[in-house]
């Protein structure tokens, strides 16, 4: 009984600690853009910002195809076998093989598009810089850390990469000619995180590839991965199609103007949704215990809080949109 109580206390402490780390990471995703975007938007101005935005958006879509739905699937399946290193290693080897295959195919298609689609040829240099992230997708292995709930490592890694990005920006980015350098810094930060992940993952698996002749059961993963991927693809297309269409139909100037407003909107949405991880455990607890009355009461409280916070934000944005845009992005916007 004593062991059980200790185990439950440790589990509660772990959940609370993970929740704090998750909130910290959410805060970083808000704070860092509030530092980098106002700085770079004033240096690269509207056209430069639009050029960066279009290339980054195109690359994100290809990166999604390279990664498939492996993160979500890997976390789910990895959590089931994480206490058996042999089984976890087999799962990792199978998912790495799928990820490598999808990455190679995606990268080939990406290169063909860059060199043969007229609009993308205009962004060739920028796309090739951002395209490096596609090649390192298979090395990310984020799902391994998600399966083992290594949120401390994930948070520390994120802090290191983002601090590097901010310092490199301040030291190296000073005028319009640094546009490609800024893209390279952004890419290096992402690639660096993937390289960290790859080498650090060795402690969780025996090897990245079977040391003996062993037939990997790759086919069994394809269907569930593609189902999850379809959901992610629909979401990604919905959120990124606007920038892509603007890029093909208009110029960098209009992309830059649109991206500035979207960037501010996304920062506010991140602030708004940062509360979700705090509410979810309570909601799940009520549902598991079949306490539906308590669930409905708690849900109504959440709804009132969301409306109470969201309505003033929306009203403030409508009334002060020009001033907010000028403060964050600069007068050219």
Please place each PLM-identified region on the residue numbering.
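Interhelical loop/hinge segments that connect adjacent transmembrane helices in multipass membrane
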Residues: 2-11, 15, 179-186, 195-239, ...
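Hydrophobic alpha-helical transmembrane segments
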Residues: 54, 124, 128-131, 155-203, ...
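Membrane-interface junctions at transmembrane-helix termini in multi-pass inner-membrane proteins
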Residues: 135-157
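Signature of the first transmembrane helix
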Residues: 13-71, 107, 166, 226-252
């Amino acid at each position: 009984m004593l062991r059980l109580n200790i185990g439950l206390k440790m589990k509660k402490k772990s959940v609370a600690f993970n929740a704090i780390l998750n909130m910290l990471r959410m805060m970083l995703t808000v704070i860092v853009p509030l530092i980098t975007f106002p700085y770079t938007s004033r240096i690269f101005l509207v056209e430069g910002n639009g050029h960066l935005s279009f290339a980054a958006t195109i690359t994100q879509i290809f990166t999604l195809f390279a990664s498939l739905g492996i993160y979500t699937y890997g976390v789910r399946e990895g959590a089931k076998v994480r206490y058996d290193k042999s089984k976890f290693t087999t799962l990792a080897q199978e998912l790495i093989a799928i990820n490598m295959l999808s990455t190679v195919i995606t990268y080939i298609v990406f290169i063909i598009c860059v060199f043969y689609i007229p609009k993308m040829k205009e962004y060739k240099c920028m796309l090739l810089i951002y395209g490096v992230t596609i090649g390192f997708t298979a090395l990310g292995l984020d799902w391994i850390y998600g399966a083992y709930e290594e949120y401390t490592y994930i948070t520390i890694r994120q802090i290191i990469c983002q601090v590097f990005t901010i310092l490199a920006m301040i030291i190296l980015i000073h005028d319009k000619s640094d546009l490609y350098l800024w893209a390279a810094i952004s890419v290096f930060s992402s690639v660096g995180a993937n390289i960290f992940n790859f080498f650090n993952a060795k402690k969780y698996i025996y090897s990245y590839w079977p040391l003996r002749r062993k037939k990997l059961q790759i086919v069994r993963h394809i269907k569930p991965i593609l189902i999850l991927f379809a959901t992610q693809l629909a979401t990604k297309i919905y959120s990124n199609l606007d920038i892509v269409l603007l890029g093909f139909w208009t110029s960098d100037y209009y992309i830059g103007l649109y991206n500035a407003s979207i960037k501010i909107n996304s920062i506010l949405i991140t602030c708004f949704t940062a509360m979700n991880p705090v509410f979810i455990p309570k909601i799940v607890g009520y549902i598991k215990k079949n306490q539906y009355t308590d669930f409905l009461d708690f849900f109504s409280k959440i709804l009132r809080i969301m409306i109470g916070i969201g309505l003033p934000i929306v009203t403030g944005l409508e009334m002060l949109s020009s001033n907010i845009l000028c403060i964050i992005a600069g007068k050219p916007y």
